[in-house]
Design a protein with these regions (language model features):
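Short helix-kink/termination motifs in transmembrane helices of multi-pass secondary transporters
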Residues: 30-41, 67-70, 84, 176, ...
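Glycine/proline-centered helix-kink
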Residues: 127, 148, 153-165, 219, ...
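Intrinsic disorder in cytosolic terminal tails and internal cytosolic loops
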Residues: 1-17, 201, 459-470
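12-transmembrane solute porter fold
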Residues: 19-40, 237-242, 249, 261-464, ...
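Hydrophobic transmembrane-helix bundles of small-molecule transporters
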Residues: 169-284, 288, 295, 306-307, ...
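Interfacial helix-cap and linker-helix signal at transmembrane-aqueous boundaries
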Residues: 45-46, 78-79, 163-171, 226, ...
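A residue-level signal for alpha-helical anchor/packing sites in multi-pass solute transporters
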Residues: 44-45, 132, 166, 256, ...
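Transmembrane-helix bundle of Major Facilitator Superfamily
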Residues: 2-193, 342, 354-357, 371
Length: 470
């Protein structure tokens, strides 16, 4: 890998850093919002395209998630190479255009294609935005910035169903996409004023194109295979092709990146033990977290017979707790204290999911006596863990690789999340006549996975002393 020549203007001011953080939080909000906002609109979409099989229409939901996870890693490398602000502005414009394409979709195929493109532009947007934040934020305040950024993304994922339900009931499913356009345009206007603080590689030093394509297709294949394996059949040709082919492409991209002077994957970052451990823990905890976030509203709907808006309101309890703990974790300066805060967060999540796997969460609704305290435990734990892991990963990155490093960290969490959701689907498929028992099993599995994450988070890792480039 060639040495990066970082072009910097004057040091960022506190005002510029705050403005950059607010813009990045807005971008995270809309990117993660669109992972979940369409779920509630799905029945309305299906009614508008009656001739399209349901199996095909599910790609309106999964197409975005697959493209998002597939492109996060190469997007981070591209942001560092092309310039983070440049890629961020282009991604915002692309997100607005693809949202409009989805809103105007005359056919299901058009809508699915629009969603895949929308997920791709979101993947370009997220690591470039976070890279801008890290470049504009003093090292001692990075934890607080990541805490705010994580809170915005987590809150979006939870309120997505409520917002989607309100838009569908008040207008039409197309409003779910239309609302992105003015929000994104406002972000473009604001982002154009971000100071040029981001690093750029020397002219022509773009990441290896072949390796970039390989890692994108490989991750996309793995996520698609894991996400759709239950529906396609785990031994079907489609699932095996996606999983085996995707795995081989990722391995090929890793081997090529280890030898290429401008690798598609920044494999050198994985030599940092704090960074590698943060990513491994993100992968494991992501599996438990995403399974819990999806099973929560399903439980409220199927077992306690809550309405869409009622379920969203109940889930907001955890989202608010997550925002509070993310803010608290971001203000902790000691690496040792942060590490134990991450362990505490994982154990809080374990306590929540163990509780939810018992008869306390039975057929009779128990909002105040069970759901609210469990939601505070689970959501609060997520806020601690996500912020601590994000700060640990960012703290191990040299400035010229901020976007590449955060992109891989987010990829680890998204791929782990896809695996967790696949486990959830497999449990429900195995117990179709016992939905309550299936939910209890899922919650127990979430607890076990989170316990593994707690053990990983507790491992002591010596943080290297900062160098002039780090």
């Amino acid at each position: 890998m060639t040495d990066a020549s970082v072009r910097l203007t004057s040091p960022p001011t506190a005002t510029a850093a705050t403005r950059t953080l607010l813009i990045a939080c807005g971008a995270a909000f809309i990117a993660f919002l669109d992972l979940s906002v369409v779920n509630i609109a799905f029945p309305s979409i299906a009614r508008d395209y009656p001739g399209t099989p349901t199996a095909t229409l599910t790609w309106v939901v999964s197409g975005y998630a697959v493209a998002f996870a597939a492109l996060l890693t190469p997007a981070g490398r591209l942001a560092d190479a092309l310039g983070r602000r440049r890629l961020f502005l282009g991604a915002l414009a692309g997100f607005a255009v693809t949202s409009l394409l989805c809103a105007l979709a005359p056919t299901a195929g058009w809508l699915i294609a629009g969603r895949v493109l929308q997920g791709g532009t979101a993947a370009l947007m997220v690591p470039s935005a976070l890279g801008l934040v890290l470049a504009a934020t003093p090292r001692e305040k990075i934890g607080a910035a990541i805490g705010a950024w994580s809170a915005a993304g987590g809150f979006a994922a939870v309120v997505g169903p409520a917002l989607g339900g309100a838009l569908v009931e008040g207008f039409d499913w197309r409003a779910v996409f239309v609302i992105n356009v003015p929000v994104t345009l406002l972000l473009i206007v604001a982002a154009a004023r971000i100071p040029a603080q981001d690093g750029r590689l020397s002219a022509g030093a773009l990441p290896d194109p072949l390796g970039t394509v390989a890692v994108a297709l490989g991750l996309g294949g793995l996520v698609a295979g894991v996400t759709e394996g239950q529906r396609w059949g785990w031994t079907s040709a489609g699932t095996l092709t996606a999983l085996i082919g995707g795995g081989l492409l990722v391995v090929a991209a890793l081997v090529r990146s280890a030898r290429h002077h401008e690798p598609a994957i920044a494999v050198d970052l994985w030599r940092s033990k704090p960074y590698a451990l943060a990513n491994a823990t993100s992968f494991v905890f992501g599996a438990a977290m995403f399974a819990w976030l999806l099973s929560g509203p399903l439980f409220l709907d199927a077992i306690w017979d809550y309405s869409v808006l009622g379920s969203a309101g109940a889930m907001t309890i955890g989202a608010v707790a997550s925002m509070v703990t993310a803010t608290v974790a971001g203000r902790v300066g000691s690496p040792t204290a942060r590490r134990w805060l991450g362990v505490l967060g994982a154990l809080m999540f374990v306590a929540c999911t163990v509780w939810m796997s018992t008869d306390a969460f039975g057929a009779t609704p128990a909002l105040w006596s069970a759901w609210v305290p469990a939601g505070v435990l689970g959501g609060g734990g997520i806020g601690f863990v996500v912020t601590v892991l994000g700060t640990a990963a960012a703290g191990a990155l040299p400035p010229q690789q901020f976007a590449a490093g955060t992109g891989m960290n987010l990829t680890a969490r998204q791929v782990g999340g896809a695996l967790g959701v696949a486990v959830l689907a497999a449990v429900f498929a195995a117990r179709p006549d016992d939905p309550l028992g299936a939910f209890h099993t899922v919650f127990a599995l979430c607890a076990g996975i989170a316990a593994v994450a707690a053990c990983l988070a507790a491992l002591p890792v010596r943080t290297p002393s900062p160098s002039p480039d780090n």
